[in-house]
């Protein structure tokens, strides 16, 4: 009996120590960190809208400034449409119809359209007839001498796209390959009424310009 009590007294502390070590080891291996939500499952924050803003609108053109600018553009367009000065560039038989338009029956002067012999005094060029490869550099040089703003009227099938000589080795297939064209007048040759109609269409195009407004917004 004394032996049993002695063995129990010596083994009991060892058993307690081993149990404590096992418990401590099991506790250390427990996952105690809280799970984190992924960004996709996180709740979105809601901000309450504030009162309406009372700040002034961003700076810009006022109604009075827009009115004045539009009236200045209208005045400039009115002056330009009533005083078109074409540079005559007759190259073939279409030039005869261009002369007919300026004669007494149609009288281009009543529209303020006056032919000028110098490109420096002109704001419009009428390319009338067949444009050859040798004449193309001269056409571009005359166009570059015209002051801004400037416009070009292509008169006749040859000036529009080569016309009857479209497949010739020496003909430019359209003067728009050399200079920018604003109005195309079809015909071979076009009548004087057709050229007059093209000039009236050019006046409508000039009347839609907004040069002063574009300059003001820069």
From Swiss-Prot:
Cofactor annotation remark: Binds 1 [4Fe-4S] cluster.
Reaction catalysed by this enzyme: a ubiquinone + NADH + 5 H(+)(in) = a ubiquinol + NAD(+) + 4 H(+)(out)
Molecular function terms, GO-annotated: 4 iron, 4 sulfur cluster binding; NADH dehydrogenase (ubiquinone) activity; quinone binding; zinc ion binding
Record keyword Zinc present: no
Localization per Swiss-Prot or TrEMBL: Mitochondrion
Binding site for [4Fe-4S] cluster: 93-94, 158, 188
NCBIfam families: nuoB_fam, PRK06411.1
EC number: 7.1.1.2
Subunit structure: Complex I is composed of at least 49 different subunits. This is a component of the iron-sulfur (IP) fragment of the enzyme.
Major location (coarse): mitochondrion
Domain of life: Eukaryota
Cofactors named for this entry: [4Fe-4S] cluster
Region (Disordered): 34-61
GO cellular component terms, A-Z: mitochondrion; plasma membrane
Protein name: NADH dehydrogenase [ubiquinone] iron-sulfur protein 7, mitochondrial
Sequence similarity: Belongs to the complex I 20 kDa subunit family.
Enzyme superclass (EC): translocase
């Amino acid at each position: 009996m004394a032996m049993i009590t002695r063995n129990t007294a010596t083994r009991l502390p060892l058993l307690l120590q081993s149990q404590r070590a096992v418990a401590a080891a099991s506790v250390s291996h427990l996952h105690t960190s809280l799970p984190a939500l992924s960004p996709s499952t996180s709740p979105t924050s809601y901000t309450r809208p504030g009162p309406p803003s009372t700040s002034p609108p961003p700076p810009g053109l006022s109604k009075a400034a827009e009115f004045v600018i539009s009236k200045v553009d209208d005045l400039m367009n009115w002056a330009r449409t009533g005083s078109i000065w074409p540079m005559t560039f007759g190259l073939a038989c279409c030039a005869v119809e261009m002369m007919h338009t300026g004669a007494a029956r149609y009288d281009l002067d009543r529209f303020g359209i006056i032919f000028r012999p110098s490109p420096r005094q002109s704001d419009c060029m009428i390319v009338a007839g067949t444009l050859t490869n040798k004449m193309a550099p001269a056409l571009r040089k005359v166009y570059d001498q015209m002051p801004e703003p400037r416009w070009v009227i292509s008169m006749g099938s040859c000036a529009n796209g080569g016309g009857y000589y479209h497949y010739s080795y020496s003909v430019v297939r359209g003067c728009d390959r050399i200079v920018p064209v604003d109005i195309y007048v079809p015909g071979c040759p076009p009548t004087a009424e057709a050229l007059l109609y093209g000039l009236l269409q050019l006046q409508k195009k000039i009347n839609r310009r907004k040069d002063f407004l574009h300059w003001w917004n820069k």
